Amino acid sequence: MMDDLKKQASIAALEAIKDGMIVGLGTGSTATHFIRELGVRVQAGLRVHGIPTSEESRKLAVEVGIPLTTLREHLIIDVTVDGADEVSDGLDLIKGLGGALVREKVVAHASKKVIIVVDETKLTGRLGIKAPIPVEVVPFALEVARGQLILWGGEAKLREKEGKPFLSDNGNYILDWWHGPIDQPWALEKQIKGVTGIVDSGIFANVASQVIAATSAGIRKLQRAE
């Protein structure tokens, strides 16, 4: 059921993709649906180039036949389609539970439009309700960064995979910081990034142009207020 909702929302996002566009390709389960559906359109004749936000997305895009390009060749992306782990009423986001938060943020900020595709369980009203804030950290600075996050409140756990520290595509560690409800996402995002050794966080404030949410009652399209 949930997987079907994600697929429906991904198909709805394809309406924004036009011939000749440069498209940012997100990471995660919902983005996977979008990449596969975009691949079907490409095979049918749609001409686009994709910029993936992770090695995982790059491999899938190649598999389904989407031509790829880079930010070096195209500094401006027409539209990026990605998922999110939480979406607030103001369309701020927590992302990065898939581990690609830094590249996702780079691509998002290079995009004219960012469409976030989710199922209804991700609409949480406020951020920090269900998900931790992923924080990407240079390995040398791990304990300093963890200590600072704990001082601010909550618990910060090193993400692991198969008994070893999880490594991002950039070769960094990720701390999952259970902060609790977030009142000012933009301020906290800036505060976290100000810690030496922290690369960035999974708070995406003022980034999403539109959120497409698949619900049991149908597709909801939410626009950021101007």
What is each residue range found by the language model?
Residues 4-7, 55-226:
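Conserved phosphate- and dinucleotide-binding cores of soluble alpha/beta proteins
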Residues 1-79, 92:
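N-terminal glycine-/serine-/threonine-rich phosphate-binding loop
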